Regions:
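Short alpha-helical transmembrane segments in multi-pass integral membrane proteins
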Residues: 1-30, 88-153, 197-253, 309-374, ...
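Residue-level signal for short hydrophobic patches within transmembrane helices
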Residues: 19, 23-42, 46, 69-76, ...
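Transmembrane helical elements of multi-pass membrane transporters/channels
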Residues: 28-47, 149, 183, 212-216, ...
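Helix-terminus/linker motif at the lipid-water interface of multi-pass membrane proteins
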Residues: 42-61, 130-137, 193-200, 260-293, ...
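Small-residue hotspots at the loop-to-helix junctions and early N-terminal turns
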Residues: 55-68, 147, 206, 278-293, ...
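Small-residue-rich hydrophobic transmembrane alpha-helices
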Residues: 60-120, 157-176, 283-347, 378-401, ...
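Hydrophobic transmembrane alpha-helices of multi-pass small-molecule transporters
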Residues: 72-75, 187-191, 217-221, 293-296, ...
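Short runs within selected transmembrane alpha-helices of multi-pass transporters and secretion channels
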Residues: 81, 150-168, 176-187, 205-220, ...
Length: 460
């Protein structure tokens, strides 16, 4: 089985993660993923820029105030797609075609069901959730309208993400990038038409997003349908296999819970920002969008770490897994340090793209001062859970992330912030929580790695 990956014939989109140089393959895998993430945010930024410029600061605040909530609702199911990625990568590397096919069809079925569930939940609970967050009266109507329309496209969003996770499992990050470019251009064009030409405001932005998600969904499903080999999709075979769903959930549910709970802490911070009014909300929206570019950059390395670790774990190459983590750490720190420094240095100029209001720009810079420069810490923090998930260990990293990240921010918001009310004090919680979580994750990784190596020695 360990030799199977040496003999498998790769198509031009796939990457052999188990043999040869690691760094250049990490870059080949991560770069399209990074560009995909950045382009996705760029197209989302077009949404924000267009609505801010042509529909006003209240519309900008309305769209921005939904971000944390949308992430809370969706990230549990997106996290489960990581379980599909890990399981598919392991079966693909080991040459288990039947198991790979079952994983693909179970994953796509789960995506469809979860997408429909999210659409119903989002439409029904949008305004209630916004009220719980203390969204100001002057923007809550537009915020609720945006969320309800946005959630109607959840089935397309989920199907694309799960389909792309399958492609990443085989080392293909290029085709999802192509699909994203096509759908993103369509989204930008629809924004121009619906918001600028037809003056539809936040509704126009949401409708454009749904249509673009439909396009990317159709493209990724068509790609899987036309593929050859174990990851080929056949709609007649769509069903849930309980055994494979359980394995997907073992990795994916803890990852999803972690992401959801962390976004709940971000929603808590959003509520604190809301208490400063619509100017601070708009500044946070713009700054958070910039931070999103940094996150997508380091997250591409985390995704690479997870996929490479999973494939090498599947064929028993444990020493290579250590080298994967080392090279990923070098890449993540370097990228985050450079991009974070640039984001802060050119922050005032970048923020003017989102708004011309100097008060909003000042709020955005106040937030970036404590988050962009220290963002390399976030990259390090996510790498260790990524490696652990690649080995099938997901629950403990989830608990530690919740304790380190969410616990710290809750203590900060309720214990420190009320006595020192400022955006600066509020967002110092980011680097503090990252450092605490890194310490916890490194200790966890050390013990799990030791256990895995001891287990391998007993099998030899």
């Amino acid at each position: 089985m360990k030799g199977w990956v040496n003999n498998v014939k790769k198509n031009r989109f796939e990457i052999d993660m188990c043999n040869g140089s690691i760094m250049d393959k990490l870059i080949s895998f991560s770069l399209p993923l990074m560009v995909s993430g950045i382009l996705q945010l760029a197209f989302n930024a077009v949404d924000i820029i267009v609505v801010g410029r042509f529909s006003g600061s209240q519309a900008l605040a309305a769209v921005g105030s939904t971000t944390a909530l949308i992430n809370v609702f969706t990230n549990l199911f997106i996290g489960i797609s990581l379980g599909a990625n890990v399981l598919a990568a392991r079966f693909y590397a080991a040459g288990k075609d039947r198991e790979m096919s079952e994983t693909v069809h179970t994953s796509i079925t789960l995506a469809l069901i979860s997408g429909i569930m999210m659409a119903v939940i989002g439409v029904l609970l949008a305004k209630w959730a916004l009220e719980i967050m203390g969204t100001p009266d002057d923007v809550i109507g537009q915020s609720a309208l945006y969320m309800r329309i946005y959630f109607m496209g959840m089935p397309f969003f989920m199907l694309y993400n799960y389909g792309a996770a399958i492609l990443r499992a085989i080392g293909d990050t290029k085709r999802p990038l192509i699909f994203l470019i096509i759908s993103g251009i369509a989204n930008a064009a629809l924004n121009m038409i619906l918001v600028i030409l037809f003056h539809m405001g936040v509704a126009g932005v949401a409708i454009g997003t749904i249509i673009s998600q439909l396009i990317s969904c159709v493209l990724v499903l068509t790609c899987l349908y036309r593929s050859e080999g174990s990851y080929q999709l056949r709609f007649s075979k769509l069903k849930i296999n309980g055994a494979y769903m359980e394995q997907i959930f073992q990795v994916g549910v803890p990852a999803g819970i972690q992401s959801t709970v962390i976004n709940l802490s971000n929603a808590l911070l959003q509520s604190s920002v809301n208490s400063f009014g619509s100017i601070a909300m708009a500044g946070y929206t713009a700054a958070n969008n910039i931070l999103g570019f940094l996150y997508m950059s380091v997250n591409s390395i985390t995704q690479a770490c997870m996929s490479f670790t999973s494939q090498n774990y599947g064929v028993g190459k444990l020493k290579r897994m250590d080298k994967v983590l080392r090279d990923c750490a070098i890449l993540s720190i370097s990228i985050a340090a450079v991009l974070g420094g640039l984001a802060y240095s050119f922050g005032p100029l970048i923020l003017t793209v989102y708004t011309s209001d100097p008060k909003v720009i000042n709020c955005g810079m106040e937030i970036l001062a404590y988050t962009s420069i220290t963002y390399f810490l976030c990259g390090i923090m996510d790498l260790f859970p990524g490696a652990l998930r690649g080995m099938g260990y997901s629950a403990v990293p989830m608990v530690l992330s919740v304790i380190g990240t969410v616990g710290t921010r809750i203590v900060w918001v309720f214990g420190i912030f009320p006595n020192h009310r400022s955006l600066s004090v509020l967002f110092v919680s980011y680097p503090v929580s990252w450092i605490i979580t890194i310490v916890l994750q490194v200790v966890c990784f050390y013990f799990v790695r030791k256990r895995v190596h001891q287990k391998e020695k007993r099998l030899l």
